[in-house]
């Protein structure tokens, strides 16, 4: 069984950004603006939901 506390430690899941897409000027759908981004070093995009993060990953591929 997976320990859910461990999953929150994974940056990509915490930011709803499984592709660990770096911060950019791209206007991704569902992107959280830099002022509201809670990533500690603000180097990675953050999305409203995992679905938006997966969408960005697929479009970025």
Q: PLM features: residue spans?
A:
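Cell-wall polysaccharide-cleaving catalytic domain and substrate-binding groove, primarily
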Residues: 1-61
């Amino acid at each position: 069984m997976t320990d859910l506390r461990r999953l929150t430690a994974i940056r990509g899941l915490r930011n709803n950004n499984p592709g660990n897409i770096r911060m950019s000027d791209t206007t991704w759908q569902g992107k959280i603006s830099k002022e509201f981004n809670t990533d500690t070093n603000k180097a990675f995009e953050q999305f409203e939901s995992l679905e938006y993060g997966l969408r960005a990953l697929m479009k970025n591929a």
